[in-house]
Amino acid sequence: MSQLTEFISCIPVVNEEQNEEDERGLCKIQIEDGAMLETLDENSLSGLRIEKMLVSEGTGIFSKSSFGINDLRIFTGENIDEESKKYVWYELLKMLTGHKVYIASLDEKVVFTKWTCRMQDDEVWKVVMELESSAIIRKIAELTLHPVKKGEIDLFEMADKLYKDICCVNDSYRNIKESDSSNRNRVEQLARERELLDKLLETRDERTRAMMVTLLNEKKKKIRELHEILRQNNIKLSDDDVLDSALINTEVQKPISELNSPGKRMKRRKTVVEPQNLQKKLKDTSRRRANRKISNQSVIKMEDDDFDDFQFFGLSKRPIITAKDKLSEKYDDITSFGDDTQSISFESDSSSDVQKHLVSLEDNGIQISAGRSDEDYGDISGSESETDASAGEKKSSNHSEQSGNDREPCLQTESETDIET
């Protein structure tokens, strides 16, 4: 079973039969699920219902159970129609709940003076919305109540409930007031801090301005001194000098384009810097590799370069030799090697024949000098014997001219051998 929320309010009670002063009555209502009042809006207002309503001035008790917006009676007239029923229902709930119900879009849509409870007789009481103008009272809406035959109501309990509600309201008001005071003090403190910061900023700006003025004056003074030095040395200044202000305002006066746009300049700077950084990294890497290669040269044995002919980006370390060139080189090497072999073998055969002939002459007791033997046997092989004779003459001359020379021991040994023979 859902919990019922109670609200206590006061309402004027008027007796139409007696011309007495208005009395005050207590009114208590019970609303199911009072938590929804916090989120009540214009759309959900029409669905809100009051479970029970009690009104008493101290002698009689009148009540109405389970009623809603459709139980209101609207008196159409000026500015009042059936569509105004929603506004009237809102004003009734606002009065009965002590302004707990509040919707800004519906507030003060109906012009009225007050709510009253009119006692017509002991059978019917009516809660009426009235508009009073020039002693004329006009009814806008009414809600009929019926008497309670058996039952009683504790007015003191209702008064105590009303008192507690007032206490809660006062406590809430005091808390809100304290919070407001704290917020105001905080705002004042922040305002004072802001004033101090503004003063500090002004002081800083003044010092910065003074420093900049001093630097500019020193710059102008230095420029005057330099001009004076140039004038004393008869150095003519260029006529193309541009003022600093013109240089500074050049980019400002130009329209925004890809040349002076900050975003474009930053993008272009990145594209220029990144390749430089990449090249720098590559150089550092190659330098580290070279240092590592030098440090490890004494420890690690160098291997043959398997990538000697490796081509990088279409280039090679040495000229590329085609298959045809390699075949020609091999043929030249074989030919030269064959010629050398033939000459060496022929010389060895001729020298062996000469030695045999000399041995036979010695056996017969005939002595012949080296030059004579070269002449007798010079025609053994045409040009080859002449070559040997010239070699013998060279050897004998070398022996006579360089007998004490140690730089050619092999030639000296051969010449001595020839002379002894």
UniProtKB/Swiss-Prot annotation:
Instruction: Report the principal subcellular site.
Output: cytoplasm
**Biased composition annotated in UniProt, kind: Basic and acidic residues:** 391-409
| Entry keywords, A to Z | Cytoplasm, DNA damage, DNA repair, Nucleus
One Gene Ontology BP term is: double-strand break repair via nonhomologous end joining
Per UniProt, subcellular location reads as:
Cytoplasm; Nucleus
Highest taxon listed in the record's lineage:
Eukaryota
Q: Does the keyword DNA damage apply?
A: yes
One cellular component (GO) term of this entry:
cytoplasm
Q: Where is this region: Disordered?
A: 365-421
The record's annotation in InterPro entries points to: XRCC4-like_C
Ranges where the record places region Interaction with NEJ1: 1-196
Q: Name one GO molecular function term.
A: chromatin binding
Could you say which protein family the record assigns here? Answer: Belongs to the XRCC4-XLF family. XLF subfamily.
Q: Describe, as the record does, how this protein assembles with itself and its partners.
A: Interacts with DNL4 (via BRCT domain). Interacts (via N-terminus) with NEJ1 (via C-terminus); the interaction is direct. The DNL4-LIF1 complex interacts with POL4.
Any extra detail in the entry?
Present with 876 molecules/cell in log phase SD medium.
According to its UniProt entry, the function of this protein is described as: Involved in non-homologous repair of DNA double-strand breaks. Stabilizes DNL4.
Q: What is this protein called?
A: Non-homologous end-joining factor LIF1
Q: Which organism is it from?
A: Saccharomyces cerevisiae (strain ATCC 204508 / S288c)
